[in-house]
From Swiss-Prot:
Name of protein: Glutamate--tRNA ligase
Motif stretch ('KMSKS' region): 316-320
Domain of life: Bacteria
UniProt-annotated binding residues for ATP: K319
Any one cellular-component term (Gene Ontology): cytosol
Length: 571
């Protein structure tokens, strides 16, 4: 052993020492310990938020623990700043873990600064490159027990093996007669070491690989696959473990109960279960979630008829081709974080939609998410559904929440609007509070970019920029000034909505407009237009647009001086 690991072999801890160092967690019966274990290799994928959401909800519902572990053993693929993206994205979506890699509070309470990374919890380190000694000690134990061996195959030799296997159409990899160092005599190993030949440590797969391995997946049910027959690499030549080896040790020692991850890992399950048993661990419960997918329009030309056939093909969201794969995209287009979360809950479990309708005032966290109710098939990315959910989420928000979250978005994406919103926060909140609350709450805001068209007329700087006003067609130019003059003369901010509309109706009738829309429709040739046209004339004059909330409430927020000044512009 000393030949392979030097002095480290003598000081290696035994598995029982690690069992004592990382005892079973003192949690209630049925508590789930789950984790999100990303690699720092790029932007935060929507699938990462999806899986984190499921993991955190299930752990909290069961009084368990959700933790973050950084799987950074693939140093070549690591991207600077990726850890910032992971930790900050989880925080933004209220998915921060209870333990693992976290960001410390900002110094001196400065919310604009970001704290340093810390590792919180008793089962760390939570960064794999800081656990190399643990993996090495378990590797030494496997060698002692005859379940691992050093392999000195060069890159050229491995390539030759691959070429031969391709020619024979057999499974590629180190197995069977191609496992050239599996039973190498000690003298040969010493010779390779003396020559300075680098080596990797490989798992010794079972001699009998004719059977199958079967397990019950938490999402997909019972799955059966051939037993793993590859002598998989456990430690690379630099002593860094592979994902397969590290995850088995980490999930056992961190006392993970459920590994919930993307279903691209199903093909590795025979190896992972084999590793757990070889290491002497009880396997965790596995649940594989299908990826969010997208439809691609595919055109194929029939070689016989020459006709073009069009079909839809499913594929998972691509990091390279699909902007919606990046969680930052949802922020950019202005979907509130809760909107994205509720959209993902719809994908996870279709029952959420009916639950939300029955419980409009409850937080999404009250929804009883169940592992065995997760959709086993891949859901399609649906931007129309996303915006529908977003609109519903915003409609349930208080004016204070709309202000806070909308301002947070505007500071990054619409700085002019943000400055106007911040100039008088209470004024802006009153504007946002119009038609908010109740069963017919304002649904004019779907995403945060909608704030500008819904708020611009409350700010003179933006209202004054409107060039072409869309006055109603049924009110000829010659009628505009007289009608607006009468409305200005009779305007009283103390009027109720009903009293003010009655004044407009009387002005309309006296000027040749029908007092009711149905009256106009019954005999359009008898009238210039109807009271709605006259009311719209006032709306356009005051707001600069036909699209605004209740005009009486808008004018109350604008205030009498501003309303009178705007009407007077057209006299």
């Amino acid at each position: 052993m000393r030949l392979l690991f030097g002095d480290a072999a003598a000081s290696a801890r035994r598995p029982e020492e690690y069992e004592a160092r990382y005892p079973r967690r003192a949690l209630p019966k049925g508590a789930m310990v789950t984790r999100y274990a990303p690699s720092p290799t790029g932007f935060m994928h929507i699938g990462g938020i999806f899986v984190s959401l499921i993991n955190k909800r299930l752990s909290l519902q069961s009084e368990g623990v959700f933790y973050l572990r950084l799987e950074d053993t693939d140093v070549k693929r690591a991207i600077p700043g990726a850890l910032d993206t992971i930790v900050d994205s989880l925080a933004r979506f209220d998915l921060s873990p209870q333990e693992g890699v976290l960001r410390a509070p900002a110094k001196d309470g400065d919310a604009s600064s970001r704290g340093e990374f810390v590792q919180q919890g008793s089962y760390g380190p939570y960064i794999q490159t800081e656990r190399v000694e643990i993996y090495r000690d378990y590797a030494i134990d496997l060698i002692r027990r005859g379940f691992a061996y050093p392999c000195f195959c060069t890159v050229e030799e491995l390539d030759a093996i691959r070429q031969e296997q391709m020619a024979l159409t057999v499974k590629p990899g180190v197995h069977g007669r191609w496992a050239k160092w599996r039973d190498a005599p000690l003298a040969r190993v010493k010779e390779a070491l003396a020559g300075g030949t680098p080596f990797v440590l490989r798992l010794r797969a079972p001699d009998d690989v004719s059977g199958r391995v079967e397990w019950k997946d938490g999402v997909k049910g019972v799955i059966s696959m051939p037993v793993n027959d590859l002598d998989t690499i456990l430690l690379k030549s630099d002593g860094i473990p592979t994902y397969h080896f590290a995850h088995a040790i980490d999930d056992h020692l961190m006392r993970t109960t459920h590994v919930i991850r993307g279903d691209e890992w199903i093909s590795s399950m025979p190896l992972h279960l084999q590793l757990f048993r070889t290491l002497g661990f009880r396997p965790v419960e596995y649940a594989h979630v299908p990826p969010i997918q997208k439809l691609d329009r595919v055109e194929e030309v029939d070689p016989e008829t020459g006709e073009t056939k069009v079909s839809d093909a499913r594929r998972k969201l691509s990091k390279r081709k699909d902007p919606e794969a990046n969680i930052a995209y949802y922020r950019e287009i202005g979907v509130p974080e809760t909107g994205t979360i509720e959209y993902l809950l719809n994908i996870a479990n279709s029952a959420f939609e009916d639950w939300r309708k029955a419980n409009p005032d409850k937080p999404y966290s009250a929804f009883p998410l169940k592992l065995n109710k997760l959709a086993p098939g891949g859901a399609l990315s649906d931007m129309v559904k996303l915006k529908s959910v977003s609109q519903a989420v915003v409609s349930r928000m208080s004016a204070e929440d709309v202000y806070a979250q909308g301002l947070d978005w505007a500071r990054e994406h619409d700085k002019e609007l943000a400055a106007l919103m911040e100039r008088d926060p209470e004024y802006t909140k009153r504007a946002l509070g119009i038609e908010r609350g109740g069963k017919k709450s304002n649904k004019r805001i779907t995403t945060w970019p909608d704030l500008r068209p819904q708020l611009f007329f409350f700010y003179d700087e933006l209202y004054d920029r409107v060039d072409a006003l869309d006055f109603p067609e049924n009110v000829p130019e010659g009628d505009r000034q007289p009608l607006l003059r009468q409305m200005l003369d009779t305007f009283d901010p103390a009027d109720s909505k009903e009293a003010w509309f009655e004044k407009i109706r009387q002005i309309a009738v006296a000027s040749g407009y029908a007092g009711e829309v149905k009256q106009y429709k019954a005999s359009p040739e008898s009238w210039k237009g109807h009271v709605g046209d006259v009311s719209m004339l006032l709306r356009v004059a005051v707001c600069g647009t036909r699209n605004s909330p209740d005009l009486t409430e808008v004018m109350a927020v604008l205030g009498e001086p501003r309303v009178r000044a705007r009407i007077a512009r057209f006299l």
